[in-house]
């Protein structure tokens, strides 16, 4: 009978990296019931969430009818749309804004969702007066504003993501990064080869571990949503420059040698693929703003550390297990066994 009072949090994109992390964290707190929306309920990711206790609901974000049914009866929602979906690559309608508005309209029609956490980002066009915009970021910002301006929700929390530490787990990305962290050059170095983050010098980058921290940070918001209405929450596990990333590798017990060599010819480095063009706009934004990845929001772990601690406490974890993971700890845990 105790479970009858659980609050249902519905996660859109529950089998993705962000949504999956949120669902897994909330499932460790018996005060919440997790409803996971996926287009593929028979996927391995969906089966894994079901095994942990999630309610799996099939739904396509382009179908307002399916979304209304999926969100009905929910107390809160986490929504992340996939900017890398192939349907958005050509830049023609429908766009990510169109998808986001369908989902928001469906949540409103469902009628019960009081609290929305939306995976958004800084409006880069507004922040730079159109000088250095990131298309996907601006689209997410538009949908988040649309939700907030609807007047339907008690709270709408815009979530800004740090750079994924997990990019260093992908060997298919390693070649594009210069070989780092998997492949050694002829001198035995694992070289990180990317444009400088910042205008003239290496500026700090906010890093987030989806596996270790992201879900708990969002979980923490749902514990006290009233405190985060229209308040940006940057999700950050650690703050490090590229040279400090190299220091994290040097500290590994494996004794690896690593170096960072800034790219000078950005266009040649990124090429003309969709992903390459999108990556180029991110670094142009970093150059123009001198590394202000979150716009006016400070690059800090303070909010994330607090929310992580609250979620871990609600899960019954020991105080020693309520801290954010550092980049050095992350490399030791996730990368060292692979190299």
Curated annotation (Swiss-Prot):
<feature type="binding site">
    <location>
        <begin position="81"/>
        <end position="83"/>
    </location>
    <ligand>
        <name>NADP(+)</name>
    </ligand>
</feature>
<comment type="similarity">
    <text>Belongs to the NmrA-type oxidoreductase family.</text>
</comment>
<dbReference type="GO" id="GO:0005634">
    <property type="term" value="C:nucleus"/>
</dbReference>
<feature type="binding site">
    <location>
        <begin position="39"/>
        <end position="43"/>
    </location>
    <ligand>
        <name>NADP(+)</name>
    </ligand>
</feature>
<dbReference type="GO" id="GO:0009820">
    <property type="term" value="P:alkaloid metabolic process"/>
</dbReference>
<protein>
    <recommendedName>
        <fullName>NmrA-like family domain-containing oxidoreductase notA</fullName>
        <ecNumber>1.-.-.-</ecNumber>
    </recommendedName>
</protein>
<dbReference type="Pfam" id="PF05368">
    <property type="entry name" value="NmrA"/>
</dbReference>
<feature type="binding site">
    <location>
        <begin position="13"/>
        <end position="18"/>
    </location>
    <ligand>
        <name>NADP(+)</name>
    </ligand>
</feature>
<dbReference type="InterPro" id="IPR051164">
    <property type="entry name" value="NmrA-like_oxidored"/>
</dbReference>
<keyword id="KW-0017">Alkaloid metabolism</keyword>
<dbReference type="InterPro" id="IPR036291">
    <property type="entry name" value="NAD(P)-bd_dom_sf"/>
</dbReference>
<keyword id="KW-0560">Oxidoreductase</keyword>
<keyword id="KW-0521">NADP</keyword>
<feature type="binding site">
    <location>
        <position position="140"/>
    </location>
    <ligand>
        <name>NADP(+)</name>
    </ligand>
</feature>
<comment type="function">
    <text>NmrA-like family domain-containing oxidoreductase; part of the gene cluster that mediates the biosynthesis of notoamide, a fungal indole alkaloid that belongs to a family of natural products containing a characteristic bicyclo[2.2.2]diazaoctane core. The first step of notoamide biosynthesis involves coupling of L-proline and L-tryptophan by the bimodular NRPS notE, to produce cyclo-L-tryptophan-L-proline called brevianamide F.</text>
</comment>
<dbReference type="InterPro" id="IPR008030">
    <property type="entry name" value="NmrA-like"/>
</dbReference>
<feature type="binding site">
    <location>
        <begin position="164"/>
        <end position="167"/>
    </location>
    <ligand>
        <name>NADP(+)</name>
    </ligand>
</feature>
<feature type="binding site">
    <location>
        <begin position="60"/>
        <end position="61"/>
    </location>
    <ligand>
        <name>NADP(+)</name>
    </ligand>
</feature>
<dbReference type="GO" id="GO:0016491">
    <property type="term" value="F:oxidoreductase activity"/>
</dbReference>
């Amino acid at each position: 009978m105790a479970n009858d009072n659980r609050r249902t949090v519905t996660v859109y994109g529950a089998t993705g990296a962000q949504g999956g992390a949120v669902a897994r964290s909330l499932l460790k707190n018996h005060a919440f019931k997790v409803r996971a929306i996926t287009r593929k309920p028979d996927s391995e990711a969906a089966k894994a969430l079901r095994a942990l206790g999630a309610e799996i609901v099939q739904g396509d974000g382009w179908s307002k009818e399916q979304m209304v049914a999926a969100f009905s009866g929910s107390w809160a929602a986490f929504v992340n749309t996939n900017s890398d979906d192939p349907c958005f690559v050509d830049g023609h309608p429908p766009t990510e804004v169109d998808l986001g508005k369908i989902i928001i309209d469906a949540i409103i029609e469902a009628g019960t969702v009081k609290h929305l956490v939306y995976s958004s980002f800084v409006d880069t066009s507004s922040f730079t007066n159109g000088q250095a915009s990131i298309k996907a970021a601006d689209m997410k910002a538009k949908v988040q504003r649309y939700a907030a301006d609807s007047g339907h929700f008690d709270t709408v929390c815009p979530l800004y993501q740090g750079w994924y530490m997990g990019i260093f787990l992908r060997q298919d990305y390693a070649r594009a990064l210069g070989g780092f962290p998997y492949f050694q050059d002829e001198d035995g170095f694992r070289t990180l080869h990317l444009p400088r983050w910042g205008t003239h010098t290496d500026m700090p980058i906010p890093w987030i571990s989806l596996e270790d921290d992201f879900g708990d940070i969002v979980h923490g918001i749902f514990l006290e949503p009233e405190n985060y209405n229209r308040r940006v929450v940057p999700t950050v596990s650690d703050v490090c420059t590229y040279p400090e990333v190299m220091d994290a590798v040097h500290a590994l017990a494996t004794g690896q040698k690593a170096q960072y060599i800034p790219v000078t010819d950005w266009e040649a480095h990124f090429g003309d693929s969709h992903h390459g063009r999108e990556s180029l706009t991110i670094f142009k934004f970093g150059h123009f703003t001198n590394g202000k990845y979150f716009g006016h929001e400070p690059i800090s772990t303070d909010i994330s550390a607090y929310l992580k601690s609250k979620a871990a406490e609600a899960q019954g974890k020991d105080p020693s297990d309520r801290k954010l993971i550092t980049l050095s700890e992350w490399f030791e845990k996730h990368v060292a066994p692979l190299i």
